[in-house]
């Protein structure tokens, strides 16, 4: 599985997300693709210091989300599952395994979304 995280001026959140993925899901740096969407908070420099993390930088200005995802998929992903994460959301233990279980439970399913919990209450996924 590859994990794509798109961030704009969210260095601290990206750092926390990476640590949570490592601790809670066993995701290794080589399975991460971080996209710096024209940040000015030092994210690019931080990524350059981590040779184990795959990354892309939008240095000519912010790009739209679909363009970024298509480019990241073209550059780094083969036939593996892809998990798209916003650095504002944290993964709960076993959430990735549950999403994969649901994804493969029926051959007609092509994508799954997690439950979103805000302030301790489940919100419907959109």
For the regions a protein language model found, what residue spans apply to each?
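Short beta-strand-to-loop acidic/aromatic patch adjacent to the donor-nucleotide binding site
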Residues: 79-90
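Conserved donor NDP-sugar-binding/catalytic core segment of glycosyltransferases
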Residues: 94-125
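Short alpha-helix within the catalytic core of nucleotide-sugar-dependent glycosyltransferases
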Residues: 18-19, 44, 70, 93-104
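Short hydrophobic beta-strand elements that form part
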Residues: 2-5, 83
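Cell-envelope/extracellular polymer assembly enzymes that use nucleotide-activated donors
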Residues: 1-2, 31
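Glycine-rich, basic loop-to-helix element that forms the pyrophosphate-binding segment
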Residues: 59-76
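A conserved acidic beta->alpha catalytic loop
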Residues: 36-44
